[in-house]
A protein has these predicted regions:
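Short hydrophobic/aromatic-rich beta-strand segments that constitute the beta-sheet cores
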Residues: 34, 65-68, 125-128
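Tryptophan-anchored aromatic micro-motifs
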Residues: 24-43
Length: 139
């Protein structure tokens, strides 16, 4: 009986660890340093604004995003979903997947009030800020 209890306990622990690792919200949480500029719109600050943002750190927590001295904390929380990248990228930033270097399907961190963030891969994200589209790497 004791062996069965031990086996059951271990199974529950392994299952909970696996479920926690598979939680997509964890892929965004952390510090991300802006490495390069994907593009910018006519309404942005142009190259000077883009250069100013290089090297800045975005901090993503479970319930907030901090970047460039501003905090965004959506009252309704974040939505995390796997999306077809092309239509979402065009809708949010008016750029093509090939310009951003994103995969055809990706994970999107979204909310009603914060900048949408696309997961490029395990260590890179793409997001827009004041009309500048940026790529950042996990610190």
């Amino acid at each position: 009986m004791k062996q069965l209890q031990t086996a059951l306990f271990i199974s529950v622990i392994v299952a909970s660890i696996s479920a926690h690792a598979a939680n997509p919200s964890n892929v965004f949480v952390g510090a991300w340093v802006v490495q390069d500029v994907v593009g910018y719109s006519d309404t942005s600050g142009g190259p000077p604004e883009a250069k100013r943002l290089l090297g800045k750190t975005m901090r993503i927590a479970r319930d907030s995003i901090d970047f460039d001295g501003q905090r965004c904390q959506p009252s309704d929380g974040f939505t995390i979903s796997t999306v077809d990248t092309a239509p979402k990228l065009l809708d949010y930033y008016q750029i093509r997947v090939t310009d951003a270097g994103l995969p055809q399907k990706t994970v999107l961190l979204d909310s009603a009030s914060c900048a949408p963030i696309f997961r490029m891969d395990a260590r890179r994200i793409v997001f827009g800020w004041d009309g500048v589209i940026l790529r950042a790497i996990k610190q």
